[in-house]
Swiss-Prot record:
Binds 1 Mn(2+) ion per subunit. This is 3-dehydro-D-guloside 4-epimerase. It comes from Escherichia coli (strain K12). It catalyses: a 3-dehydro-D-guloside = a 3-dehydro-D-glucoside. It is an enzyme of class 5 (isomerase). Disulfide bonds: none annotated.
Length: 262
């Protein structure tokens, strides 16, 4: 299994040193912040060349969600995502992770009444994805549509929700990203959800049930990795979560070493 990581607070700030550190820890790739990539693309290229550590994907680094309630923010976000995809193409990255929104609204907390109808939600997200479909086609990249749990987003919560957008809009350059943490909240059966969407699953985020490092909680990574292998999953699995330990760096190393046994 190819395992990557997002940035962590204890990683070096210098870009080359960051890449060296991630490579030395034993990771196979780096999921970079989109803004960091765009603003430092030559340094990133140099770091990739020196270390051999690929930038697999981007996550974050733009302002405005593809399902934003505010049209100006949505359009601004699309422009920024376009630039990130162009930058990813320059450095050999595969694509960008995008949710419909994050932290914008939830039916689970007051006021519990959305300022937009569900049909309006579907129209905005679909319109955005059709725009990004063209960008991804032009740049040879992929948009990884991410379902989030019900407390962080109200529009796309399950892999089946993401699948519906892709199928109904006939999108060829949009795939699903499955995040074990969010899936553990929303899916009836994580392994079954992965299997049912194996044809569109292009990327995976991992954290344990409590959002901390894999191996420190209750998720059955052995079973989930077995499912991915059985379905011939060829993408990366990327650490996205926090670390709970007195020595975060050592705990991260230990988690990765343990995950390699799954």
């Amino acid at each position: 299994m190819k395992i990557g990581t997002q940035n962590q607070a204890f990683f070096p700030e210098n870009i080359l040193e960051k890449f060296r550190y991630i490579k030395e820890m034993g990771f196979d790739g780096f999921e970079i912040d989109g803004k960091l990539l765009v603003n430092n693309i030559e340094e990133v290229k140099a770091a990739i060349k020196e270390t051999g550590l690929p930038v697999t994907t981007a996550c974050g680094g733009y302002d405005g969600w593809i399902g934003d309630f505010i049209e100006e923010r949505r359009l601004n976000g699309l422009k920024q995502i376009e630039r990130i995809l162009e930058a990813l193409a320059e450095v050999g990255g595969k694509g960008i992770v995008v949710p419909a929104a994050w932290g914008m609204f939830t039916f689970r907390l007051p006021p519990m009444t959305s300022p937009r109808s569900l049909d309006g939600d579907r129209k905005m997200v679909s319109d955005s994805l059709r725009v990004l479909e063209q960008v991804a086609a032009r740049t040879g990249t992929v948009v990884y549509l991410e379902p989030l749990n019900r407390y962080q987003d109200h529009m796309i919560n399950t892999l089946a929700d993401a699948r519906r957008y892709i199928v109904e809009n006939d999108l060829k350059h949009v795939q699903i990203i499955g995040d074990f943490y969010h899936m553990n909240i929303e899916e009836d059966n994580l392994a079954q959800a992965l299997h049912d969407n194996r044809d569109l699953l292009g990327h995976v985020h991992i954290a344990d049930n409590h959002r901390y490092q894999p191996g420190s909680g209750t998720l059955d990574f052995h079973a989930l990795f077995e499912q991915l292998r059985a379905d011939n999953y060829q993408g990366y699995v990327v650490y996205e979560g926090r670390i709970r330990a007195e020595d975060p760096a050592q705990a991260y190393r230990d988690s990765l070493a343990w995950l390699r046994t799954c």
